[in-house]
């Protein structure tokens, strides 16, 4: 409905806009100049009587402008009528909701006339759906009554308070559940209900004190999960330690291999040095023997020469 009203308002505003006529003053002036040259010549004279004779076509145009002004005023009335219709529709919607609430309250107060009221409401709802398809049906939410367990801790004499509480409750409900019953009957009924309720508290306490199988299973699973987590942690620590040990062993072996290689190199160098020194010694010894032989020959030759001189 609001969209339709907005569309109508826009259309009314479009129709209300003034239409500009083609400016044909130049052609009219030319026609007047050809037809009435004397009148145009006298237009410059300040005689008001002659000017009124020439202003007759402008007066004719003023009537058209009046019609345009009348057309401009009409859409405002239509807009006001649309606003008035919107107000009427809103009032009808409010009345419809109030009537529906009153009908629901009447149904709750008078359940015996359900058939007649249902038929009338069904017919009304069918008519309302056809008239107002956009409205949502009013639904009532019913909450279920959940029984609660009352505790009597910190109330002095719990047994007496419980008896008073139960009796007051039963006296409040007596008119609705047991019409025409006396107070003695109600008190006996309360006592019987108290006696019936007393053994029911023992199994509840037993169930609360005794752990269920499900709780035990949950505890076992929790313990097993903790043990598994602990075992996983220990395994991870052991693996880390083994990795460290292997790394240390590898480093030690590598260092030993490097040391052995260095020692072998040193031993080879020492052996090569000894071999070279032995070869040098062997080369020096034959030279010394040759020198001694030369010396002996010289000595013997000198002795022979001296002996020959002496002779």
From Swiss-Prot:
PROSITE patterns: OSTEOPONTIN
Region feature Disordered, mapped onto this chain: 28-138, 167-311
Compositionally biased intervals (Polar residues): 47-62
In-chain residues carrying the UniProt-annotated modification Phosphoserine: 24, 26-27, 62-63, 76, 78, 81, 105, 114, 117, 120, 123, 126, 188, 192, 212, 216, 221, 225, 231, 236, 251, 255, 260, 264, 267, 272, 277, 288, 300, 305, 307-308
Biased composition (Acidic residues): 86-96
GO BP terms, alphabetized: biomineral tissue development; cell adhesion; osteoblast differentiation; positive regulation of bone resorption
Statement: the UniProt record of this protein carries the keyword Transmembrane helix: no
Compositionally biased residues, Low complexity: 260-270
Its biological purpose: Major non-collagenous bone protein that binds tightly to hydroxyapatite. Appears to form an integral part of the mineralized matrix. Probably important to cell-matrix interaction. Acts as a cytokine involved in enhancing production of interferon-gamma and interleukin-12 and reducing production of interleukin-10 and is essential in the pathway that leads to type I immunity.
Binding partners and assembly: Interacts (via N-terminus) with integrin ITGA9:ITGB1.
Protein name per Swiss-Prot or TrEMBL: Osteopontin
């Amino acid at each position: 409905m609001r969209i339709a009203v907005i569309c109508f308002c826009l259309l009314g505003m479009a129709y209300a806009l003034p239409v500009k006529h083609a400016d044909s003053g130049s052609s009219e002036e030319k026609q007047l100049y050809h037809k009435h040259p004397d009148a145009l010549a006298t237009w410059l004279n300040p005689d008001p009587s002659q000017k009124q004779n020439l202003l007759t076509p402008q007066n004719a145009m003023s009537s058209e402008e009046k019609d345009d002004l009348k057309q401009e005023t009409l859409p405002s009335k239509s807009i006001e009528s649309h606003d008035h219709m919107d107000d009427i529709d809103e009032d009808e919607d409010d009345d419809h909701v109030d009537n529906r609430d009153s009908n629901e309250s009447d149904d709750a107060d008078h359940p015996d006339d359900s058939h007649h009221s249902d038929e009338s409401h069904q017919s009304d709802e069918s008519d309302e759906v056809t008239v107002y398809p956009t409205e949502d049906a009013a639904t009532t939410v019913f909450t279920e009554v959940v029984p609660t367990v009352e505790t009597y801790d910190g109330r002095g004499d719990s047994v007496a308070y419980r008896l008073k509480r139960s009796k007051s409750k039963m006296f409040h409900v007596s008119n609705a559940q047991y019409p025409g019953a006396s107070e003695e009957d109600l008190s006996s009924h309360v006592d019987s209900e108290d006696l019936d309720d007393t053994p029911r508290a023992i199994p509840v306490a037993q169930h609360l004190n005794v752990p269920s199988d499900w709780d035990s299973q949950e505890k076992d699973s929790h313990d097993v999960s903790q043990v598994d987590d602990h075992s996983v942690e220990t395994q991870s620590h052991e693996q880390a330690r083994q990795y460290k040990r292997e790394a240390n062993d590898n480093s030690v072996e590598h260092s030993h291999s490097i040391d052995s290689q260095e020692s072998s190199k040193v031993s080879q160098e020492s052996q090569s040095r000894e071999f070279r020194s032995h070869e040098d010694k062997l080369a020096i010894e034959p030279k010394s023997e040759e020198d001694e032989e030369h010396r002996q020959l010289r000595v013997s030759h000198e002795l022979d020469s001296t002996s020959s001189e002496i002779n």
